[in-house]
């Protein structure tokens, strides 16, 4: 097979129910210069590996790599090493590409050769929005805004130059949020090779994202959640300050960081496997005493940035963090009442914007 323009890397693990939809969406793409699909079977215990082989048997554009179960980062790294194209895209086995997605991404790249191309996604499989070539260009100092717009943290809504991406790797030490580190590594590399690059964003949703997957905070408990996310946020903040992101973006970023962390603390109380309640409370209390959290709260105070979780975390009130997180999770109006109560208790000195 001659060298294709674009390669799609799909890590596969227990994906028998969705793999056919995923691969069919890739192979249906019309790409000038051709495409290659690499399926990496990460030691899946179900019939996923056989399904991968069946696709390779009937379509020469499909290559299958089988490996022992080592996690999604190792699977992506294996696919990355095998990629033989000018550009590449990552796709998860329970997601799908919308018709025309890959050529739209390539067209955007050709329009702005020095840019980093990203696109929106949809969680509605029946979304009828047309795939168009409409783009928005953003400068490098909108990095924090990309996070706030839910465009930054994932690897599968971006077009990568294969030669550049192959200089990097997904960090296997992380069990959560490792995608963000890879994306930031790529942006850092791009900034060194093309200092004047910009972000080119396709406004149409090109990927269907199945948000019912396991692994999010809402579906899976991570014992090291309150350790991992501060590390990711420290890296993100460093990149944002280096990009000179404006305060009007940094304030909501810090607010979002506090929300992620506080709700991780509440999740310790709700789902930590420790049988004794006192043990769970001790873990939550330790998380609320984190130096990273103290530094974040102090930064927010200096910036004048309010969050509903600001006072509960400042007071290290396990009970109040729990009540607010549960109210937000269940959609209770109590969350809004406590949010505004904290705002007025602070004399409206901190900003809500």
Region spans (language model):
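A conserved acidic beta->alpha catalytic loop
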Residues: 25, 41-50
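Short, well-formed alpha-helical segments that are part of the catalytic scaffolds
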Residues: 15-28
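Glycine-rich, basic loop-to-helix element that forms the pyrophosphate-binding segment
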Residues: 67-83
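Conserved nucleotide-sugar donor-binding catalytic segment
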Residues: 143-223
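Catalytic core of nucleotide-sugar-dependent glycosyltransferases
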Residues: 205-213, 219-251, 260-264, 271-300
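Short aromatic/hydrophobic "clamp" motif used to bind/position activated sugar donors
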Residues: 88
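Membrane-interface aromatic/basic loop that binds lipid-linked glycans or pyrophosphate carriers
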Residues: 270-353
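Flexible acidic/His/Gly-enriched loops in nucleotide-sugar-dependent glycosyltransferase catalytic domains
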Residues: 98-174
């Amino acid at each position: 097979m001659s060298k294709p323009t674009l390669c799609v890397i799909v890590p596969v693990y227990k994906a028998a129910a969705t793999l056919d939809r995923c691969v069919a969406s890739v192979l249906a793409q019309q790409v000038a210069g051709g495409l290659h699909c690499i399926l990496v079977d990460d030691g899946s215990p179900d019939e996923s590996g056989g399904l991968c082989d069946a696709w390779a048997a009937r379509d020469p554009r499909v290559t299958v790599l089988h490996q022992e179960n080592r996690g999604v980062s190792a699977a992506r790294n294996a696919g990355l090493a095998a990629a033989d194209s000018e550009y590449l895209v990552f796709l998860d086995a329970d997601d799908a590409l919308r018709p025309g997605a890959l050529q739209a991404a390539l067209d955007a790249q050709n329009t702005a050769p020095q840019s980093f191309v990203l696109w929106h996604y949809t969680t509605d499989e029946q979304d009828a929005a047309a795939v168009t070539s409409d783009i928005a260009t953003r400068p490098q100092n909108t990095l924090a805004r990309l996070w706030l717009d839910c465009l930054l943290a994932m690897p599968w809504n971006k077009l990568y130059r294969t030669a550049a991406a192959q200089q990097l790797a997904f960090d296997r030490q992380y069990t959560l949020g490792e995608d963000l580190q890879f994306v930031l590594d790529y942006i850092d590399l791009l900034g060194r090779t093309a200092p004047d690059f910009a972000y080119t964003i396709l406004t149409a949703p090109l990927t269907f994202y199945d948000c019912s997957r396991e692994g999010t905070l809402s579906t899976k408990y991570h014992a090291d959640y309150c350790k991992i996310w501060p590390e990711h946020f420290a890296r993100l903040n460093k990149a944002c300050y280096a990009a000179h992101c404006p305060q009007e973006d940094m304030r909501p970023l810090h607010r979002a960081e506090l929300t992620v962390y506080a709700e991780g603390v509440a999740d310790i109380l709700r789902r930590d496997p420790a049988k004794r309640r006192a043990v769970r409370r001790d873990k939550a209390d330790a998380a609320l005493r984190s130096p990273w959290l103290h530094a974040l709260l102090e930064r927010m105070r200096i910036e004048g940035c309010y969050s509903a979780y600001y006072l509960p975390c400042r007071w290290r009130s396990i009970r109040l963090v729990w009540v607010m997180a549960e109210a937000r999770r269940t959609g209770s109006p109590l969350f809004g009442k406590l949010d505004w109560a904290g705002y007025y208790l602070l004399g409206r000195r901190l900003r809500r914007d």
